[in-house]
Curated annotation (Swiss-Prot):
It comes from Saccharomyces cerevisiae (strain ATCC 204508 / S288c) (Baker's yeast). The gene is HGH1. This is Protein HGH1. InterPro entries: ARM-type_fold (IPR016024), Hgh1 (IPR039717), Protein_HGH1_C (IPR007206), Protein_HGH1_N (IPR007205). The keyword Acetylation applies. SUPFAM superfamilies: ARM repeat. Residues 357-394 are annotated as: Disordered. Residues 371-394 have a biased composition (Acidic residues). The keyword Flavoprotein does not apply. It comes from the Eukaryota. GO terms for cellular component: cytoplasm; nucleus. One of its GO terms (molecular function) is translation elongation factor binding.
Amino acid sequence: MTSQLNELVEFLHSPQPAVRQIAIDNLVGFSAGPTSKVFKNDSYRPIKDIIKMIMDPEHGTRVIIQQGVTILVNLSEDKLVRNIILSDDKKFLKFLVWKIVDLTNPNADIMCILLSNLAKDDGILAVLNIKRNSSGEEVDDGLKLAALNKEVFKSLRAMDCLMDCFVKGYDKKLTKYASFNYLAFFFADISRFKLGRMYFIEEQEYDGVVPISKLLVFTEKYDAKVRREGVASTIKNSLFDSETHERLLKDEKINLLPYILLPIASAKDSEIDEEDMFNLPDELQLLPEDKERDPIPAIICCHLESILLLCTTHAGREYLRDKSVYPLVRELHKNVENEDIGELCYRIVNMLMRGEPGAGAVEEMPSKNAEEEEEEESEEEEDDDEEDEIVEVA
C-alpha cells in the first residue's frame, strides 16, 4: 500500500489535469491518520501541488477545490504544512479569504475550517492587512476573484468582510451554501494575538461599530455550539489587556457584561434577593421561565474565565460587585455539579468578596463538601491561550 500511495501522490504533479483530478480524488481518504505522511514526500511537494490545483482558475473545479481544501484541513495539524500554506507572499491566504467571502462559493464552510486551523500561527495576522482594490473587481493582486458583493459588504478589508459573513450569514441567511460557523474559531485564535484582539475591541471606520459587540448575541445561540464556543473564546481573549476593561464594561454601545452573564444564568436561580436582582444588568432581570444555562460546561468555564480576567483591576472588581455578579456566581456554584465550574466560581468569589485592603469582613460562599478549599491568594489570571485544537474532516 505504501508504494502505491507514493506512486499515486506523484500524479498530483502531472501536467495533465485529468490525471491530477484522479489522483486527488483517490488521496482524500488518506489525508487523516498515519497514511497522511505520504503528503510530506519530496519536501512537502504534494502540498504545494494541491495548493496550485485549488487556485487553478481554469481547472480548479468545485470538486477539486473541495477535495483539495479537505486534504489541507486534515494536514494542517502539522506546523510545517501551515507554514507552506501561508508562504508565497500570503497569496493562498488572500485567495482563501476572498473565496470565503464569495457568496456563490459552495465550498465556503470547509474553507472556514481551513482558515480557523491556519490561525494557530502568527502568520495569520497578515489577514488584517488584506484588502481588495478600490473597485473590488474580479482581478486583484494577480488573483482571479469573484467581484465583491457591494450590497452586503461595505468595506474592502478582508477582516471586515469575514465579520459580515459571520454575523449576517448565521443559519444560512446570507447564502444557501454556508453558515460560516467556523469563523468563530478563526476569530478565537486570531484574538490570541495582540494585533488580532485589537481589531475586535476598536471601533471600525467602515461602520462605526466595535466588532466584539456584533458577536455578543451569539453567546446564547444554543443551537450553534461552534458559534457559542468560538465567540466565548474570542470574548475571553479580547480581555487579556486589562487597560481596556473599564471601557469595555462601561461603554453602552458594547454592553459586554450581560452577554457574559446570560449563558451562566438560569431562571431557576431562585435565591437571588430583590436588591441583588435589581442591581443585575437589565437583561438578567425577570428572565423568562424557560431560560436555561449553556448546556456545555466548557463554555460556561470560558465565560467564568472572562469574569476572572475582569477581576484583575480594582475598577473591574468594583463594577462587577455593583452589578451583583457574586450572587449570580453563587447560584451557579450551588446548582451545577461540575468540578471545573466549581473551582472557577471559588476563584471569582475570592477576587470579589474578600474585599479590598482595609475593608471589613465579607460573606463566604458555602462549600459543597466537608473539605475546606485552599484559598487563592493571587489576583491575576494567567493568560490561558486557546488549546491548539485542529479540526479534521472525515
